[in-house]
A protein has these predicted regions:
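Conserved beta-strand positions in repeat-built beta-propeller and related beta-rich domains
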Residues: 1, 53, 60-64, 98-103, ...
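Structural signal for beta-propeller blades
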Residues: 2-5, 66-69, 104-107, 165-167
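Beta-rich catalytic cores
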Residues: 44-47, 64, 84-85, 145, ...
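Short coil/turn segments that connect the beta-strands within blades of beta-propeller domains
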Residues: 55-57, 93-95, 154-155
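Short loop/turn segments that connect beta-strands within beta-propeller blades
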Residues: 8-11, 71-75, 110-113, 171-174
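A structural motif specific to WD40 beta-propellers
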Residues: 15, 77, 177-178
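Surface-exposed loop and turn segments in beta-propeller and other repeat-based domains
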Residues: 11-44, 116-142, 181-197
Length: 198
């Protein structure tokens, strides 16, 4: 519903909520109490798919947000524009790292002249290598869909793709160095990745 929920680890309750409202690329944070009966309208215009927090604030991405949004605790602004259909957008070095799910690639784009820009293809499997292709009806993540992303080092990232594959990408070398297919069933897909413990 174009919302972010905050989970309180001490009380084990979702006790903070924020709906992101947009009007012609102007964004507004509308706070609400998720424990009350009064909540936001049930809209899913932005298809929010990830939140990344650091000392600079909260970064929010979605398939239809137009880019990576930044919430500083008061206001929401567009930090950077991105292609439609992106997943897992997050600040990285001096730019942005994200899954360009429509193009089946992991992308890093720096703020410079493009010398550091990277686009590395996710693993591509032939139909004969995958199972349950009959389920690929648009309701599940299609094969080769890039989703799930986390930083390993300042030049290495882990990314997910469908069907259930985790790959390691070396941005310095601009290549995928290893992949592990957990399943070749198209009904199964990676959603998020994180280094543990963190």
């Amino acid at each position: 519903f174009d919302c972010i929920l905050g989970f309180n680890l001490d009380t084990a309750v979702f006790d903070w909520g924020m709906q992101i409202q947009e009007n012609q690329y102007r964004f507004r944070a509308a706070r609400f109490d998720p424990t009350s009966d009064d909540g936001p309208m049930m809209l899913n215009r932005m298809h929010i798919n990830n939140v990344h927090c650091n000392a600079a604030g909260m970064y929010i991405g979605g398939r239809r947000t137009g880019g990576m949004l930044h919430y500083n605790g008061k206001t929401i602004t567009m930090a950077v524009t991105l292609p439609t259909g992106t997943h897992n957008a997050q600040p990285f070095r001096d730019g942005v790292l994200f899954n360009d799910s429509e193009a089946n690639v992991v992308r890093y784009t720096g703020r410079g002249e493009g010398d550091e820009d990277r686009a590395i293809e996710v693993p591509i499997y032939g139909d004969e290598e995958m199972t349950h292709l009959w389920a690929n009806d648009g309701e599940v993540a299609r094969p080769h869909f890039a989703r799930g992303l986390c930083q390993v080092t300042d030049s290495v990232v882990a990314g997910g793709s469908s069907p259930s594959t985790v790959s390691i990408y070396d941005l310095r070398e601009n290549k995928r160095v290893v992949e592990v297919a957990i399943s070749r069933d198209v009904r199964n897909a990676i959603h998020g990745l994180e280094i543990w413990p963190h």
